[in-house]
């Protein structure tokens, strides 16, 4: 199985904060599932993600909740059908903003939100947008999160720089993505050539503090930018 890992990022330079990133796709159409399969229909992707990613989303939500301050303003980049944003808003009381490049996916996320809030809880804000040009003022968020998508961004370093910009001083970024060097997949050969996510932090005002095992993905912890671009990796 292709294993993702999490990046925990604290913004450096002018914004000593952090965000979570998970959005922005390359020219390819469709939404990535584990193993590199691209699903082109938002409804089909929503159904598959419920069936295949439910435990993963639950673990991520629990992990985010341990990091986010009470009532924190949180941006999810690449929210897809909204499962993580909805869970974090309803169950953990976070002020969630979910962002996705695909209008059809945001429509699906809004429909899922309508059903979820009927059972009570906070409602996330869901918007169409691109990590390459985040439509938020600087210092807007206490936390940014993203799952399994950074390797699809056209400009990962630029996306991380945008995340650093919208983080408030002292905030964090949590990013889950696949490890480099995974075996090729017949439906997603690009996953055989995934670069190390740490490489994209150089020049983005973010730096990796450590990489540690997470229950089944990997987690990278990033702190304020180091001008040397060094990263400490823990097995």
Q: What residue ranges belong to the model's regions?
A:
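Short amphipathic, positively biased membrane-proximal segments
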Residues: 1-34, 230-235
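C-terminal alpha-helical "lid/dimerization" subdomain adjacent to the S-adenosyl-L-methionine
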Residues: 25-38, 48-53, 174-227
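Conserved alpha-helix/loop element of class I SAM-dependent methyltransferases that forms part
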Residues: 52-70
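Class I SAM-dependent methyltransferase SAM/SAH-binding core
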Residues: 75, 81-133
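A short acidic, Gly/Pro-enriched loop at the edge of an enzyme's catalytic core
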Residues: 132-143
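A short SAM/SAH-binding and catalytic strip from SAM-dependent methyltransferases
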Residues: 143-154
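A short glycine-rich, Lys/Arg-flanked "PGG" loop and its adjoining helix->strand segment in the class I
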Residues: 157-169
